[in-house]
Amino acid sequence: MNNLIKSKLELLPTSPGCYIHKDKNGTIIYVGKAKNLRNRVRSYFRGSHDTKTEALVSEIVDFEFIVTESNIEALLLEINLIKENKPKYNIMLKDDKSYPFIKITNERYPRLIITRQVKKDGGLYFGPYPDVGAANEIKRLLDRIFPFRKCTNPPSKVCFYYHIGQCMAHTICKKDEIYFKSMAQEVSDFLKGQDNKIIDELKGKMAAAAQTMEFERAAEYRDLIQAIGTLRTKQRVMAKDLQNRDVFGYYVDKGWMCVQVFFVRQGKLIERDVNLFPYFNDPDEDFLTYVGQFYQEKSHLVPNEVLIPQDIDEEAVKALVDSKILKPQRGEKKQLVNLAIKNARVSLEQKFNLLEKSVEKTQGAIENLGRLLQIPTPVRIESFDNSNIMGTSPVSAMVVFVNGKPSKKDYRKYKIKTVVGPDDYASMREVIRRRYGRVQREALTPPDLIVIDGGQGQVNIAKQVIQEELGLDIPIAGLQKNDKHQTHELLFGDPLEVVDLSRNSQEFFLLQRIQDEVHRFAITFHRQLRSKNSFSSQLDGIDGLGPKRKQNLMRHFKSLTKIKEASVDEIVEVGVPRAVAEAVQTKLNPQETEILLQVAEERVDYQTEGNHNKP
């Protein structure tokens, strides 16, 4: 805790409000709310905390606070601050998560469509549905029953669906607005589970078709009735009153919270939303923050009712959601909340069980690897791979695994500086020398094991640099691939020998992951560099096109291909002078330029020839 924080802690009021934690760069990393700012903020800097809170506190170098009139006002302010600043330690819902809805469009001749965007456009929306497959299944059924418009044909034509009774043919339709409203109401009733009327109508049509010997049409009506029955069985009825409601439940353990939301539509449970995240405040307060963020998402329509657990502040939720808020005491609504809580507990327990198994596997893998190689447990493993094509843009990459897991903040990329042509051995010598020369100079923590993606030659080069040049004592192993480019053999020892390693063991899978990751990282870096060099080289030598304009072109068009396809006017719009834009097109499209010149020359020749022939 620095002196600035110590001084500010003395100034904290006992009022409700929001506090804002910042890191060394002044970036907001956490926003919280409190009924008593003094007690809450001081608690971060006193006593011991769990690992995740320690990680947060270790980054705090400053904080600010905003006093509010009430706890509810603090809650609303907190949600807005989180939305605006997106702090990395706060609960952040996925922006791209949305559910499909079935929509009847607000048009003269309505259409039935599936959409993920809910707009105030006068359309009727039904849902959400668990996935687009479920929405499509229901829409296909509705299309067979209700003849909504499906085409955009000109006035003189009708579409195929008109001939099979699935389109009203707006080009010749004489129906009025009342007819369409009536049909929309029937769809609404159907989706609310009030489908007996439609089933009775279909049964009547089936009987009439059978009496007139139209057996194929009767079979179609029979299939429709069966499809409705199948749909009924897929949607579990959770409430007899057929209301739309969201049911919230949550469970906390070991510093983590799981929130489950059941979407009940027309009395049927159609989907659930699950989120697991670490919490830093009181669980009920972080739950309120979650609810506020949940209904800020455009894909979450506010239902008629929202059911919440008993220990949640009902008035606070009312301030967040414009809906009827209930804390049910008994009956089927209470059972729904209990079911949501139970599912939240199960989800959290599953997460911890999976984490424990994962830790056991990775910890066991590195311990077994250490025993196999007769070295201390390799907690930190650094792995290297080279990448080049015929010696062009040679690079090397290093990935780091700590306790069997990737530590991406420690990854490093290297442009090879001293090697000309395709020489893997010389490239490996350079990158090992650069990496561990720096480790030695700056007294960095050395790895417990170095893994080279390569065979005996590359490993021996690494050994020469590490042991003979730098005088370091770090175990070095090699991973050889087979002709299918798959992890095949582990090399270790002095002299190098193939280690007897079961291909079904956890340590083999760990080494395989390391080799795949370092190869991926090296290849990705090489492609980026090659693409950049290709882009630069093709635009080099154009007068008036410096690094800044090249950068602007790439930022605007995203690729060299798009620049080639762009017109001179489009390039000028990026801020490039017309003469330079023309030079860019000439350089990138030499064949097209030649053709244009030939056409121009032919036109001149033709005009000249015509002038000679004039009397």
From Swiss-Prot:
Q: Where is the GIY-YIG domain?
A: 14-91
What is a GO molecular function of this protein?
DNA binding
Keywords (alphabetical) are: Cytoplasm, DNA damage, DNA excision, DNA repair, Excision nuclease, SOS response
**Annotated GO CC locations:** cytoplasm; excinuclease repair complex
Q: Which GO terms describe its biological process?
A: nucleotide-excision repair; SOS response
Which subcellular locations apply to this protein? Cytoplasm
Q: Which domain of life is it from?
A: Bacteria
- InterPro entries, per database record: GIY-YIG_endonuc, GIY-YIG_endonuc_sf, GIY-YIG_UvrC_Cho, RuvA_2-like, UVR_dom, UVR_dom_sf, UvrABC_protein_C, UvrC
Sequence ranges assigned to domain UVR in this UniProt record: 196-231
The record, for SUPFAM superfamilies, names: C-terminal UvrC-binding domain of UvrB (SSF46600), GIY-YIG endonuclease (SSF82771), RuvA domain 2-like (SSF47781)
Please describe what this protein does.
The UvrABC repair system catalyzes the recognition and processing of DNA lesions. UvrC both incises the 5' and 3' sides of the lesion. The N-terminal half is responsible for the 3' incision and the C-terminal half is responsible for the 5' incision.
Describe its assembly. Interacts with UvrB in an incision complex.
Give the protein family. Answer: Belongs to the UvrC family.
| Name of the molecule in the record | UvrABC system protein C
